[in-house]
Amino acid sequence: GGISVPGPMGPSGPRGLPGPPGAPGPQGFQGPPGEPGEPGSGPMGPRGPPGPPGKNGDDGEAGKPGRPGERGPPGPQGARGLPGTAGLPGMKGHRGFSGLDGAKGDAGPAGPKQMGPRGPGERGRPGASGPAGARGNDGATGAAGPPGPTGPAGPPGFPGAVGAKGEAGPQGARGSEGPQGVRGEPGPPGPAGAAGPAGNPGADGQPGAKGANGAPGIAGAPGFPGARGPSGPQGPSGPPGPKGNSGEPGAPGSKAKGEPGPTGIQGPPGPAGEEGKRGARGEPGPTGLPGPPGERGGPGSRGFPGADGVAGPKGPAGERGSPGPAGPKGSPGEAGRPGEAGLPGAKGLTGSPGSPGPDGKTGPPGPAGQDGRPGPGPPGARGQAGVMGFPGPKGAAGEPGKAGERGVPGPPGAVGPAGKDGEAGAQGPPGPAGPAGERGEQGPAGPGFQGLPGPAGPPGEAGKPGEQGVPGDLGAPGPSGARGERGFPGERGVQGPPGPAGPRGLQGMPGERGAAGLPGPKGDRGDAGPKGADGAPGKDGVRGLTGPIGPPGPAGAPGDKGESGPSGPAGPTGARGAPGDRGEPGPPGPAGFAGPPGADGQPGAKGEPGDAGAKGDAGPPGPAGPTGPPGPIGNLGAPGPKGARGSAGPPGATGFPGAAGRVGPPGPSGNAGPPGPPGPVGKEGGKGPRGETGPAEVGPPGPPGPGEKGSPGADGPAGAPGTPGPQGISGQRGVVGLPGQRGERGFPGLPGPSGEPGKQGPSGSSGERGPPGPMGPPGLAGPPGESGREGPGAEGSPGRDGSPGPKGDRGETGPGPPGAPGAPGAPGPVGPAGKSGDRGETGPGPAGPAGPAGARGPAGPQGPRGDKGETGEQGDRGIKGHRGFSGLQGPAGPPGSPGEQGPSGASGPAGPRGPPGSAGSPGKDGLNGLPGPIGPPGPRGRTGDAGPVGPPGPPGPPGPPGPP
C-alpha cells in the first residue's frame, strides 16, 4: 500500500470577536456568621534587624516660674521640743498617666519569604507563653532634701516602668537609675485571642471581556480503510434448462470460410441476484493531527499592591448567577506565598440550576461509586413517552431475501414534532456522598456584590478598676529644676498577648467610585461538566469547494462482490484483430456447474496427447443416442501445404468465472485507448474501501446553526492568595463614620492578553452510534478512478456463478473425412485439460459431405469435479484509466429526531493545574476601613534616667511648740 503523506497546513482562520460580558448575578442574602477557624501556625520567620531609633519630639516651652510666697513674720523662739513620734506613712500618690508612645520606627526589612510549597503536616498547636524577662534592680532611695519650689512642667517623658507597690517613705531626691536589667528573649507566641468581627466584604471586580477565539485547527488526517467485510452467501444454482428439439440434418456446407455474420440482438437482462450481507464495520481511524497553537498573548502589566482593608464579615453566598465568559489566560505570574487559612464561610443557598452546557467530550470512565440505598420516598408519576431513543443492539442476521428492483428515491419526509418531555418524578432521598474529586483548575472570578454588614461583635471586657490610694499632703512648690539632657529612646519591649476584641464601629461613608480594574488572569480549567442535552440539528452548511485531486491512496481491501448487473445490448461485430501474443498461463478456476449439453460440434484437429489425468469417479452410463446415417467416404487426398493461421472467430458465450488467481508482478503501462461508448447505468455496488483524504484546505465558514448558545461553565475554585504587601505605617484611629451608600458599579475592564493555548487533552472514547438517517438521493456517478496498485489481499471466498464466457475460436478442420457418428458411449472419467496442439495441415482431398446431425441426447448427470488445471500465463496489464472527477454531493437528508439525553458521564480527572496568572493592575484606594479592635497593651517601658537634684527649697514654717 502507499504511504499516507499529510498535506500542507492550511492558513489560520480569522480571529473571533470578543463575546459580551456576562450578566451580574442577583444580590445574595446575608447568611449567619461562620464559625471561627483554628488559628494557623506557620513557621515563624527569622526576626528582622531592629529599625533605627525614632526621633525624639521637640521639647515644649519652659513654664514660667511661680511667684514665691510672702514671708511671714517670725514667730517666737520656742523651746526645743522633744522629738516627736514618727509620722504615719504618707498616702500613696495617684498613678500617673501613661506617657504617649514614641513615634514608630521605620519597619525593618522583611525576612525572606517562604517560597516553598506548603508542607502536608497538620497545624501545630500554639506554643506556651515564654517567661517574662528579668526585671532590673530598683535604684537606691536618695536622702530627702528640702522641698523646692514647683518648677514649670517639662515635656512629657517616655513612659516609665511600673514599679512595685511599696510603702511611701519620706520623699527625697530621685536617686540615680540603677543598671538596666538584661532583656529577656522573646517567648513563643501566645495563644491567639478571639477573632475580631469581620469587616464588610469588598465589592468584586467586573468580569473580564471574553478573549478572542483561537484559529481553527487543521482537520485531522482520515482514518485507514476498515477491514473487508465477509462475502455474502453463494446463491443457489438454477435448474438445468429443458432439452431442446433435435434439429434436422443440414446440407453439407461449403468448405470456404464465410465472413462472420452480424451479432445478434442481446437478450433481456436476467434477474438480479440476491444481495449479499453487509460487511462488518471498519475499525476507527487514527486520531487527527492537533491544530496549530494560537498566538501567545503578552504579559499584563503588574499592578501595585493596594492598601490592606479591614476584612468585613463574610456575607452569605448569593444565588448563583450566569457565569460570565471566561477571560483569556494570562501570562504565568510568580508563585504566591501561601496565606494562612481563613475562617470558613457559611454555607450558601442552593443556586438555581444553570442552562445545559454544550456537549463535552466523553471523558474516561471514573471509578464506580457505591450504590445508594433505596430511599423511602413514594414512586414518581409515570412520565410521558419521550423522543425516539438510540437504536438497540443489532439482531441476528436474517436469511437474505431476494433483492427487488430499486425504486426512485422519494422526497425527504418532514421532520416530525418533538415529543413532550416526561413529567419529573418525585425526588428521591440523597445517596451517600461519593469520594471527593480532585480540585479543579481555577476559574474566573464571578461578579459578586457587596454583602450586608454583619452583626456587631460582642463588647470588650471592661478593665478592672485600680485601687484608690490615699491622697497625700500637698507639698510646697519647689524651685524649677534645670532641664535635663535628652535621653535616648528605649528598645521596644516584647509584644504582649492580644487583648479582647472591642465593639465594632459603625460603617464608614462610601468612598469615591473606583476605576475599572484590568481583568484578572484566566483561571485553570474546571472539571468537565455533565453532558448536556442534544442540541437541535443545525442547518445544512454551504457545500465546500472541491479540493485538489490528492495522490492515489494505497490499495484498499477488496470490497464485497456486487450484484450482477443486467446484460447490456450486444455491440456491433468488431473487426478481426491481429492475433495477440500468448499470455502467461492464468490460475486455474474452480469447476463450474454443469451446463446443458451442447450440440455436437465438428471434429477438431487432433491435439497433442495430454498428460494423463487422475482417474475420476465413474459416472452412471448415459442413454444411448440414435445412430446417425453414415456419410459417404471421400477420397483420400494428398497432403497440401500448411495453411495460414486463421483469423479469430466471433466471441463465444461467457464462461463461468475462475477463482481468484495469485497476484502477479505488475506489467508495463499500456497506451491509453480511445474512450468507449457509455454503458448502461448499473446498479449501485457495495461500498468500496475508503481512500486517503487529500491535503485539507480550510473552506469558508458555514452559517451558524440554529441551536441555542450554551451557557458558560461553572466558576472554578478560588486561586491561591498573593504575596502580602509591605506593612504600612499605622495610622491614627479615625472617627467612626455613618454607614455609607453603595457606590456605583465601575465600567468593565479592558480585555486581557490572550493566553497560551492549552495542551491537547487525551482523546475521548467513541460516542454511541446514532440512528441511521434516511438515505439521500444517489449522487452523480463520476468517471472511473485510477486503478490502485495491486495489494497482497487475502484470498477471497469463491465467487458466485458468473455470466458465460466468450465463445472460443472454432477449431480447424482435420485432414480426414468425417466419419460416421458412433453411438455415444458411457461417459468416461474427466481427464485433465489438454494443451492446445499446433494447427494441423490441411489435407489435399476434397471435403466429404457432412453427415446428418445426430439427435441430441438427454442431459447427462453432472460429472465429478475435474482436477485443477495448469496455471495460465499472466495477461498484460490493462490500460490505466483516467482518474474521474469527484462526484457532486447529494442533498442532505432530513434531520433525524433528537435522541434522549444520555446519563451524565463520570467526571474526568482534573487537568494539570496551570501556572498562576500575573498580578492585576492596582485598584484605586478603597474606602476607609472600620477601625480595628483595640490592640493589646504595649510592652513595659524602660525606666527613665534620674533627673538632676533640684536646688534647696525655702525653709519651712516653724513647727508647733513641744510639750512642756
UniProtKB/Swiss-Prot annotation:
Keywords: Extinct organism protein, Extracellular matrix, Glycoprotein, Hydroxylation, Phosphoprotein, Secreted. Residues 294-303 have a biased composition (Gly residues). Contains mostly 4-hydroxyproline. Proline residues at the third position of the tripeptide repeating unit (G-X-Y) are hydroxylated in some or all of the chains. Contains 3-hydroxyproline at a few sites. This modification occurs on the first proline residue in the sequence motif Gly-Pro-Hyp, where Hyp is 4-hydroxyproline. The modification 3-hydroxyproline is found at residues 665, 936, 951, 954, 957. The modification 5-hydroxylysine is found at residues 92, 243, 314, 531, 642, 807, 868, 880. Residues 56-70, 865-879 have a biased composition (Basic and acidic residues). It comes from Parocnus serus (Greater Haitian ground sloth). Residues 106-117, 126-144, 192-231, 347-373, 381-400, 459-468, 564-578, 591-618, 647-663, 709-721, 850-864, 898-931 have a biased composition (Low complexity). Glycans are attached at residues 92, 880. GO terms for cellular component: extracellular region. These protein fragments were extracted from an ancient humerus epiphysis bone collected in Haiti. Residues 1-964 are annotated as: Disordered. Expressed in bones. Residues 146-158, 620-632, 771-781, 815-830, 949-964 have a biased composition (Pro residues). The modification 4-hydroxyproline is found at residues 18, 21, 24, 33, 36, 39, 53, 68, 74, 83, 89, 126, 147, 156, 159, 186, 189, 201, 207, 216, 222, 225, 240, 249, 252, 260, 269, 284, 290, 299, 305, 323, 332, 338, 344, 353, 356, 365, 374, 379, 391, 400, 409, 412, 430, 447, 453, 459, 465, 471, 477, 489, 498, 510, 519, 537, 552, 558, 579, 585, 588, 597, 603, 621, 630, 639, 651, 657, 666, 675, 678, 704, 712, 721, 739, 748, 751, 757, 772, 778, 784, 792, 798, 818, 821, 824, 895, 898, 916, 931, 937, 952, 955, 958, 961, 964. It is found in: Secreted; Secreted, Extracellular space; Secreted, Extracellular space, Extracellular matrix. Type I collagen is a member of group I collagen (fibrillar forming collagen). Trimers of one alpha 2(I) and two alpha 1(I) chains. The keyword Secreted applies. This is Collagen alpha-1(I) chain. It holds the Pfam family Collagen.
